A protein has these predicted regions:
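A glycosyltransferase accessory/donor-loop signature
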Residues: 1-3, 9, 164, 168-348
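Conserved donor-nucleotide/metal-binding helix-loop-beta segment in metal-dependent transferases, i.e.
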Residues: 107-141
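Short aromatic/hydrophobic "clamp" motif used to bind/position activated sugar donors
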Residues: 100
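Short, acidic, metal-binding catalytic loop of nucleotide-sugar glycosyltransferases
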Residues: 23-31
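Active-site-proximal specificity loops/subdomain of glycosyltransferases
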Residues: 44, 52-93
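Short glycine- and hydrophobic/aromatic-rich loop-to-beta-strand nucleating segment
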Residues: 153-162
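Short internal beta-strands
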Residues: 33-39, 128-129
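N-proximal low-complexity "stem/linker" segments adjacent to membrane-targeting elements
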Residues: 1-22
Length: 348
């Protein structure tokens, strides 16, 4: 039974995808099949093929048009101009069996992902890492405040279970209940948490270590986000993951990404690893590594940048409350209707 790696990218994110792919294959032990859902990659496709060949691998490119067509037929509107954010949830239509590890392009891998791919999902169709965002987001999407809310940047799919529970169809049903112009933390993430409510296994936090939380203590996260060990991670799990992360996820937009001049990111070993990998692959690339390193090192001298990175939970809470309160009654009715329909279907 084969195991699989999945990315989704276009020509604008190709260089980020290349860095992640190179770091993945540099650390990988064992055989995997690599799939990339591509949108308008054109000649940039050769960048990724070249990296795969360095490690005697091939890439199965899946045109986004195949998935887009299905979404258009279901009257699903695009999100931010396209359908790429949704594509990962249709991978069971393209893979016969085994496990699929999906990775966002804004990641860098620091170890062998083989043990993660074989992680026990407890019968669930997919696994994810709990997001650090405020528990109030749960209320705003019609869930209980202390339900677990998951990040969609790194996902582990069990293909057989995806087919058994019809993951693509549940996604299509859920997206119809959501106003895509007013999502709190990204349409794909919100849809995932609604569509697979109580069907997502919790992965170790080390599988998706975000810059936005690495300077928190567990008690700070629990305080700022109104979470606790029951709907987040224990103190021991949190510290172990911070000390030995498997996958670094530069989530949070330009503020938390080392390749962006704007924002608050400052130099650390993960930024250094990203820059070194990028320079190796793109010595004349679009990012000026020397300039970026200088900016990051300057930021490191100022405590503000260290402090500013520790408030994403509060930021997400305020953002979610501001954007969501107006739509709260409508959202709760839609979610209850969706969950009621799902329960009726499962009882047939």
């Amino acid at each position: 039974m084969a195991n699989h790696i999945l990315y989704a990218t276009d020509k604008n994110y190709c260089e980020l995808c290349a860095v992640s792919l190179y770091s993945l294959l540099s650390n990988l032990h064992g055989e995997v099949v690599i799939h990339i859902i591509e949108s308008s990659l054109e000649e940039r496709k050769d960048d990724l093929i070249k990296i795969a060949k360095m490690f005697n691998k091939e890439i199965d490119f899946i045109p986004i048009e195949d998935i887009s067509r299905r979404l258009v037929e279901a009257d699903i509107p695009p999100y931010r101009g396209g359908y790429s954010p949704y594509a990962r949830f249709f991978i069971s239509d393209y893979v016969d069996d085994g496990r699929v590890l999906y990775l966002d392009c804004d990641t860098i891998i620091k170890g062998d992902v083989a043990p993660l791919i074989n992680y026990d999902l407890n019968g669930c169709p997919l696994g994810a890492v709990i997001d650090q965002s405020s528990s109030h987001v749960n209320v705003l999407i019609g869930h209980h405040q202390h339900d677990r809310y998951y990040n969609s940047g790194i996902l582990l799919f069990d293909v057989a279970k995806c087919r058994e529970t019809d993951v693509p169809e549940r996604f299509l049903e859920a997206v119809k209940t959501i106003d895509l112009s007013n999502t709190f933390l990204g349409a794909d993430q919100e849809i995932m948490n609604v569509a697979y409510y109580h069907q997502i296994a919790t992965l170790p936090q080390s599988a998706n270590m975000m810059f936005t939380i690495r300077f928190f203590e567990p008690s700070q996260i629990w305080s700022v986000s109104s979470k606790g060990p029951s709907d987040y991670y224990t103190k021991e799990e949190f510290i172990a993951s911070k000390n030995n992360p498997l996958i670094i996820h530069f989530a949070g937009g330009g503020r938390y990404q080392p390749w962006r001049e704007e924002g608050i990111y400052y130099m650390d070993e993960d930024a250094d690893l990203w820059f070194d990998t990028y320079e190796k692959l793109y010595p004349d690339g679009r990012y000026d590594v020397a300039k970026l390193k200088k900016i990051m090192n300057e930021r490191k001298k100022h405590s503000f940048f260290k402090t500013a990175g520790t408030f994403p939970g509060l930021y997400c809470s305020l953002k979610g409350l501001y954007r969501g309160l107006k739509l709260l009654p409508k959202r709760i009715r839609a979610r209850r209707a969706f969950k009621s329909g799902s329960s009726a279907s499962s009882g047939d």
